[in-house]
Amino acid sequence: MLNVCLTTYPARVANVPRVLDSLRTQTILPDRFVITLCKADERLRHIFDNMPDVEVLIVDDDTKVWKKFLPAMDALHMKHDDLVLTVDDDKLYPPQMIADFMWAHSEFPDAPISGNHYWHNGLKCHCGGCSLVQPRHMAGWQKYYAYWKQLPSDDMFYTMLAARNKFAYMQTATNWERTATPFNEGQPYSVHGMVQQTYLRTAKLFGWI
């Protein structure tokens, strides 16, 4: 089963219907959307009442980016053959985005797969042509991607995606589960820890980091 997972909060929830609309026009459609809200934001749930393809989960704690997928993987009892695609609540995705991820998954079926970004005219942009709902300058963006340089080079593959977008590429790491460090509250944004937690839950993860 292909699960598209995301989270949101009051300042961004108005974006989510547009984000979902961009995902409903994909060339490959997901089996379901899962939106996780923290309990303090449960009042936002009504926005999705008339969306039968959306499952809303409520969690006690606000675990930030981890809310995108860990609660869903636990609550929905995902299995090893389930796929988890994480998306953002402020991006509009092009129709081929899911197909590109599925292609990369078919090439590297045992690897977590991450979309990456490029820098254009002072704005951070996602590969594959998706756009920000509200474009904004992302000063200091480099620090969020410094961890790529810390991974062993023999664990990394750089695979060109479609020639239609010269900026588009995927990064996969076949041995992240080996190099992963344990998740703990002191490192809530550790990509290594995120991947380790995903492998412990057996479902396969890919998405925007």
Which residues does each predicted region cover?
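Residues at the starts of beta-strands that form the adenosine-phosphate
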Residues: 31-32, 83
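Conserved nucleotide-sugar donor-binding
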Residues: 125-143
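C-terminal catalytic/acceptor-binding lobe
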Residues: 1, 7, 14-19, 145-209
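Conserved donor-nucleotide/metal-binding helix-loop-beta segment in metal-dependent transferases, i.e.
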Residues: 95-119
